[in-house]
């Protein structure tokens, strides 16, 4: 992953955490070459992205802020091929499916700043992310949302977040094209992180 020096962005964040949901970490891997599995390779085959761009964003935030990382991992995994997953993901959304997680959800009572990352599926957050926000109260936190998308941007996700969390204040938001190269994604996202420290 890319190496980025610490910056003024880390100042003023207080106790911070990066919580994220990444597709490549929530798939059935039986019979797959695990080293080849990423949100990029699973979706599109080997190419210009070594890892999914959401993980690029997570890595850059961690390097520049020193925040604790907490990945959300579900017990019932998705299909490993992206196109096999998307129809089921729509059914999950329409039926308000309730996922369970491999680990207890994080205690953020002493956290000042939350960076939260996820993909955008069907113009919304994945259902496991919705389930997370149904259970963990973000009121009073400095909340920054980052995502990857395939043309929708953050669509109506911020409004959806506010429906799930009436006490939530979104301090900043950013969405990257999931199909960018890792290099261009890192350059673009770093520029956004720079703006947070100004």
Language-model regions: role of each:
Residues 6-198:
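Active-site-proximal alpha-helix that buttresses catalytic centers in soluble enzyme cores
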């Amino acid at each position: 992953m890319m190496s980025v020096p610490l910056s003024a962005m880390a100042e003023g964040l207080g106790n911070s955490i990066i919580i994220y949901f990444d597709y490549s970490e929530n798939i059935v891997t039986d019979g797959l070459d695990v080293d080849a599995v990423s949100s990029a390779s699973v979706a599109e085959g080997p190419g210009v992205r070594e890892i999914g761009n959401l993980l690029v964003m997570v890595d850059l935030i961690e390097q520049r802020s020193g925040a604790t990382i907490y990945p959300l991992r579900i017990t019932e995994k998705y299909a490993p091929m992206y196109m096999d997953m998307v129809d089921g993901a729509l059914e999950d959304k329409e039926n308000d499916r309730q996922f369970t997680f491999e680990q207890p959800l994080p205690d953020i009572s002493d956290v000042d700043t939350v960076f939260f990352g996820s993909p955008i599926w069907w113009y919304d957050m994945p259902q496991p992310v919705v389930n997370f926000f149904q259970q963990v109260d973000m009121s009073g936190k400095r909340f920054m949302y980052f995502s990857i998308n395939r043309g929708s941007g953050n669509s109506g996700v911020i409004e959806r977040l506010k429906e799930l969390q009436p006490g939530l204040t979104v301090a900043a938001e950013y969405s990257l094209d999931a199909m960018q190269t890792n290099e261009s994604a890192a350059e673009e996202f770093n520029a956004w992180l720079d703006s947070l420290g100004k």
